[in-house]
Amino acid sequence: MRNTILFGVSMILLANLCFGIMSAFVKITADYFSPMENVFYRSITMTLLLLLIYPFKPYRLKSYKQGGFKKLAFRVVVGGLAMLAFFYNIEKISLATATAFSQCAPIYTVLLSPLLLKEKLKRSALISACIGLVGVVLISDPSVENVGLVEIIMGILSGIFVSLAYITLRDLREYYDKQAVILAFAFGMSLLGLAGMFIDIPFLSTGVHIPRKEDILWISLIGISGTLGQYFLTYAYMNAPAGIIAPIEYTRIVWGLLFGLYLGDTFLDLKSSLGVALILCSGLLIALPALLKELKKI
């Protein structure tokens, strides 16, 4: 049991590192490609990699039972919108702040679950979510590092859409293999990204830019790191309880800070640092009951 949990913890740490690397590469390409193009290139590369792997490690592509397609389509759409909003913020603000906005998903999950899943909202979870919302307000200061109204809206939406994707994943387990969900997401986002590239969407899509020689490397690395991150994430949740894995996901903010500083981001000021700290504390408090419950079983 302990070895399995240790393996799961190792997997989530590797997943967060890979996602941090992917975000850094997206920031590098953001000067040339629009957020929509980055979504397409990330997704199409991931799709091709998954199709190459499939013959060596096949899995069931058809649903276990009827009724799951609409849920899968919804997961693709909200997951894609989350990625699009996140990629926009990677271009405009520091990597740490963009990642912190995205990692607010558990906060919104607490608030949305009673509405969407009819789950009872515990007082402790509500207090934890409120702490996180204070953190969101602190990092949403327009006077800090060019965080304007659009960036704030995109940041909040990225967290909400990730939250909706997580909520949907709970139901999808009954209908599809986990790997099939990953492939469907990558393929669906490739189609949406391709279509979006040819539509002029303010802030998000500015036409098609033909990849230069140096861009081929960055595009490949975005796809490879994103695919590895998704695989490590899947194996983490397959080998260790979610209550133990979920709190460790917040190390993604640390990687966002480190890679952002390396790429030229300025260090967060006191107010933004406090906001990130409150978001971290909020997420840990939300996950704490499940964490303690799982630790008692060891």
Swiss-Prot record:
Keyword Aminoacyl-tRNA synthetase set for record: no
Keywords: Cell membrane, Membrane, Repeat, Transmembrane, Transmembrane helix, Transport
TM segment ranges: 5-25, 36-56, 76-96, 97-117, 124-144, 147-167, 181-201, 216-236, 244-264, 272-292
InterPro entries: EamA_dom
Residue ranges of every copy of the EamA domain listed in the record: 17-141, 183-288
Annotated membrane topology: Multi-pass membrane protein
Disulfide bonds: none
Keyword flag Oxidoreductase: no
Gene3D superfamilies reported for this sequence: 1.10.3730.20
Protein family according to the UniProt entry: Belongs to the EamA transporter family.
Protein name: Uncharacterized transporter jhp_1155
Species this chain originates from: Helicobacter pylori (strain J99 / ATCC 700824) (Campylobacter pylori J99)
